[in-house]
Amino acid sequence: MEVAKHRWRYGALLALILIIPAALWASFMRSDEPMRIEVSLGARTLKVIENGDVKNTYGIAIGRPSHPTPTGSFRTGLIDWNPAWTPPPTAWARNKEYQPPGAASNPMQAVKIYFQAPYYFIHGTNDPGSIGEAASHGCIRMTPGDASSLAHQIQDAGGHVPMIIHE
């Protein structure tokens, strides 16, 4: 009798572990969202989809194999206009220097859009030739003009837009 009671509890717990994430996923990616972003790492594109229609498609740079861009479901967060760049506390950035807002060498350029804190962003680039390549340390790079255009669209949609990143 005691074993059956514990099996029931474990079964209920397992059901919750499976059902709750599915429900959260469904609410996160509701089809009634007016805008969403789809990133294809393989195609090196970022699509803005509004009411089911592709409104814009942008070329992007993605993470190198040694520093891949994360895949999964996210929401855009804070939009930081004219950001400074502070080297993250990672090995690859050990000898890099702080870059003030507006500096030509600032890798963020005009805007950075948070999508997975603390180190993954969509942002402009000071190396537009990297678009279409696996060139970043995990962030999604866009030309400065495209990044600004995307940031304005996200702001117009309320600031927190669902985003899927897939291979």
Q: Which residues make up each language-model segment?
A:
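N-terminal Sec-pathway targeting helices
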Residues: 2-17
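Polar low-complexity intrinsically disordered regions enriched in Ser/Thr and small residues
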Residues: 11-14, 66, 75, 127
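Exported/periplasmic cell-wall-interacting domains
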Residues: 30-32, 71, 90-167
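Low-complexity, intrinsically disordered short peptide segments enriched in small/polar/basic residues
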Residues: 14-17, 34, 151
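Cell wall/extracellular polymer interaction/catalysis modules
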Residues: 4, 21-91, 97-117
